[in-house]
Amino acid sequence: MVHKPVLLNEVVEALSPKDGSVYVDATFGGGGYSRRILETAQCVVYAIDQDVVVKKYFDELLQSFPGRLNLAISRFSKLREVVLSFGVDKVDGVVFDLGTSAMQLADASRGFSFMNSGSLDMRMCSSALRDAAMFVNTVPEKEMADVIYQYGGERYSRRVARAIIDARRKCRINNTGDLATIIRSAVPRSRVHPIDPATRTFQAIRIWVNNELEELQAGLETAAEVLKIGGKILVTSFHSLEDRVVKHKFRSLCDMGFSLINKKAIMPTDEEVKNNPRSRSGKLRAIARVE
């Protein structure tokens, strides 16, 4: 399954790639953002992704843009080191497309989705020390409930944590299918919001496993450090926690020589939502360095 980048037209319009410029695609994934940027101008893109699986998509895209595309398998928090490793000090723009890709969700062995039972993994980086199995089988009940509430917004977080603890006392929880069943037993289905009861808890576990909010904060800080005057940072987020981090960081940057490109987040059009339902929750925020 190929990942469809959300708000792609809006991102490229706001970024406005120029010939001779240098950009960072901080979430390469399937290469959707990188491809459009490279098609728009005779520029160079330095791509970053912590998932080694993306090398396949990078190799394919590199054939179309030899000498203009580079990849580093790394994290947001290492963005500055990555840029310097390519012999560059400052760049003209950095783009982030947050969350999981369609390829990650479609691969049951990665454990990101409960649609098909698979390993309790959820690691964006295969060398990371903690995974979803560690969370559900070792984390204490109170900490588990707090994570599920804070990162997933799950109002029944304590019931979910209790159900997981009770289940793991009987036997180790080994796959996403079993975990989803346990969660569903603790969360009543809503008639108003008919999403799967496991959705919020799976999101919370994924954020915990990958330290996502801290990585995002660090990524935004380092992106600001490597930006030229006139350069831009663009972030597409998919849930309120991500958007809050972006909004607060951008607000603080406005006191440090930056200016918001759009005062309000840009949302996908009705047509995009129709063609790509995943885009429904997407929000694009953009900021430029002016001094």
From Swiss-Prot:
The keyword rRNA processing applies. GO terms for biological process: rRNA base methylation. S-adenosyl-L-methionine binds at residues 31-33, 49, 76, 97, 104. Coiled coil: none annotated. Keywords: Cytoplasm, Methyltransferase, rRNA processing, S-adenosyl-L-methionine, Transferase. Specifically methylates the N4 position of cytidine in position 1402 (C1402) of 16S rRNA. This is Ribosomal RNA small subunit methyltransferase H. It comes from Anaplasma marginale (strain St. Maries).
